[in-house]
C-alpha cells in the first residue's frame, strides 16, 4: 500500500482535533499503519475531566528501534472570519495548503507515516524496527500525552533507540534548521500582600505595589547565566501584573504578577525557584511564590545520526542545515529521557496563526527526506561512518538559528 502525503495531510486537517481532542485522527492513522503490518496500540490516559488518545505503532523487524514522534492536536483557530477558508476544510491555493495544523504538525505526521508505509510497500529490509508515537495532547494536557506513553512503554519494557520529532523547525526554507535541544520553561506566579487603605492616608496602609515593583526590578536585573556553546543565556519576561483595582482612591491589599523564565541546560527549575524566592525575601516576607515547570531544557549532543539527517536533507533539497536550540518547548523534552532525539520538519512561519499554511511541494520533499533518513539510519554509507564533522563544526556562539 502506498499513500499520498498531501492527501493524508488534508485528511488529518479535516479532523477538528482542538487540543486535547483527536476527533478520530488517531484511529485513522492506526488503520493506515495496521494495513502495512504495524502493531498498533491506542492508549487512552486521563481523569474524570479529560481523556487523551495516543498511538504507539511499531513495525517489528529487529531489536533496534527508530521512532518518529508527533502530535495531531492543534490550537484553536481563533476568529473564523479572519481565515480565507474554513480552517478544518483544507484548501490548496497557489501551491499552499491552508488549514489549522497544516504546519504544526499534521503535514509532518503525514510525511513520516507516508515514508514508513512506502518503505514497507517497497519491501525495504529494515535492519531493526521502526515505530510512531503520536499524541493528541502536546498543545495542552501534556501529562496524558507523550509523557504518559513513555511511562507505559517503560512498564512494558518497550525501548526506543533514537527518535525524530516532526516539529516544524525550518525557518526560511525547508531543511535549513535541525533542532538538537530546547530551552526549558518555568512559569511563576507571585502574590505580594499589604494592607488596604485610603490613598489620602498612606501611613495607615501598606501598598504592596511598591514591593512588587522592587522585586520585579531585581529579577529583571539578575543575570542567570551567560549561556554556553549550545544555548543563549536564560531569560525572564514579565507577562502580567494585576491588582484588580476598579477605583482610584483605594490602596488594595494584594498584587499578583506572572513571569516566565526560559532557561538553558545550565539551570534547573528547583535552582531557579530558590533564586527567585531569595530575591522576594530580600524585599518582603509577606508574599506567596508558586512555579510550574513541565518540559525542561535538554540537549542531544550531535552524533552520527545528526550527520545522517544532514545528508538526507542535502540530498533532497541541496541545503546545508544548521543546528539550533531556539524556540519554544516540545515533547522532545520528555523523549530525551529515554533516548537521543532531534527535531526536524516544516517551515514554522505560520504555526498557530490565522491562515496557517504549508507549501504542497514541501510535503513531498519532507517525505523524501524522512525516507532517506530511515534508509541511511539502518544502512549508513561509508562516508557517514567516517564522518565526524557535525560535532567538530558546532559554532562557538549559541545555536540561535
Curated annotation (Swiss-Prot):
Q: What enzyme class is recorded for this protein?
A: hydrolase
Q: Which cofactor does it need?
A: Zn(2+); Co(2+)
EC number(s) stated in the UniProt entry for this protein: 3.5.1.18
UniProt catalytic activity: N-succinyl-(2S,6S)-2,6-diaminopimelate + H2O = (2S,6S)-2,6-diaminopimelate + succinate
Tell me the pathway. Answer: Amino-acid biosynthesis; L-lysine biosynthesis via DAP pathway; LL-2,6-diaminopimelate from (S)-tetrahydrodipicolinate (succinylase route): step 3/3
Protein role: Catalyzes the hydrolysis of N-succinyl-L,L-diaminopimelic acid (SDAP), forming succinate and LL-2,6-diaminopimelate (DAP), an intermediate involved in the bacterial biosynthesis of lysine and meso-diaminopimelic acid, an essential component of bacterial cell walls.
Which protein, by its recorded name, is this?
A: Succinyl-diaminopimelate desuccinylase
Q: Please state which protein family the record places this protein in.
A: Belongs to the peptidase M20A family. DapE subfamily.
What is said about its interaction partners and assembly?
Answer: Homodimer.
